[in-house]
Amino acid sequence: MPGTALSPLLLLLLLSWASRNEAAPDQDEIDCLPGLAKQPSFRQYSGYLRASDSKHFHYWFVESQNDPKNSPVVLWLNGGPGCSSLDGLLTEHGPFLIQPDGVTLEYNPYAWNLIANVLYIESPAGVGFSYSDDKMYVTNDTEVAENNYEALKDFFRLFPEYKDNKLFLTGESYAGIYIPTLAVLVMQDPSMNLQGLAVGNGLASYEQNDNSLVYFAYYHGLLGNRLWTSLQTHCCAQNKCNFYDNKDPECVNNLLEVSRIVGKSGLNIYNLYAPCAGGVPGRHRYEDTLVVQDFGNIFTRLPLKRRFPEALMRSGDKVRLDPPCTNTTAPSNYLNNPYVRKALHIPESLPRWDMCNFLVNLQYRRLYQSMNSQYLKLLSSQKYQILLYNGDVDMACNFMGDEWFVDSLNQKMEVQRRPWLVDYGESGEQVAGFVKECSHITFLTIKGAGHMVPTDKPRAAFTMFSRFLNKEPY
């Protein structure tokens, strides 16, 4: 009846319903995470975001350790394609890092959630704990961007208290494709407070990545003079070399040899000066499972590059995809522990967690050869700060190729290339790498770091991240 007062019970129910819709989802909160000697003071959540009608992306969200209400929200995506972003959480810059025993977590003094609310999403469907109802895992760059955007929208629906916070999109490796394609969608959505993006050792251009890698390999002493001379003779003309899609038969043979040296000879493609975990990579078999260690990102135009994995899939063998020269045993053991899965609210029906998914990678359709148009669109708005950073001893996505890519965008130079410094306490300030700043886009190297910068140089990575978020000079 009009004007009738609500009963106290009904009022209480309505208030509780409203509060649930204005705050983080209680059912996703991690109450007790196995492996920690002491549970964290910050709140963390694990559950699922709706990426499409049939796709469910697993997320793990760690609130900032310092003033979460006013800290930015930072999305992190690992690459592959086909690899889990929990690699970033547990081995790079998460609040706690997995130890070699695969059981223990130790707090990370350089965790990125010291100053930000960090959202880790496993993408695309089929990766890690993410899944699709129809179990169809064929996808492509455009669909993944749309799925990531829908998942991000769902995150802000579940966590409306963060919708006005500054938003930064970040990632690594093949996230060099994921992040700018997602950013182009997000920039058109006024409900999201996008401030910028940062990509570490990202794949921005296949052509520049391949062309630069040959120079990187030669000047790091990996190619002999005979091979280098032959490359110059058969792959170059008029002072310009094409190591990307050259059709000269001798050039192709030379590039196959470069590809073998860089990726198959026992060198660590992710960090030239680090040992290769497990020894020389190749055809490893564990428990009747064949392990493949090639993501198909370098020298993609060479013949025979994809025939071996395709033949493997037809053979019916169990195949696993692992990052080369990387020991994934500890994170795999941890995330497949039934108590951990329960703490993370993972359905029992889902298969085991693997760092990377072979089928997702093999069936993935790469639609873009360059991110040039995406970055130019983002830069044309003059609203966003963009950082491309590279560990300078990575060969998978080497620093030179990404620097060439930034140069090709032809943005106005504001700060010439110079060293940037990190304070190492008793050791004093040290050169951490080099940086050059153009209008709204910065290129930065981290000296002595490989593909996974926060793993190799955690203090430098955190310093860079802090300066990026706070718009401070590097």
Swiss-Prot record:
GO terms for cellular component: lysosome; mitochondrion. Heterodimer of a 32 kDa chain and a 20 kDa chain; disulfide-linked. It comes from Mus musculus (Mouse). GO terms for molecular function: serine-type carboxypeptidase activity. The keyword Transcription regulation does not apply. This is Lysosomal protective protein. The lineage of its organism: Eukaryota, Metazoa, Chordata, Craniata, Vertebrata. It is found in: Lysosome. It catalyses: Release of a C-terminal amino acid with broad specificity.
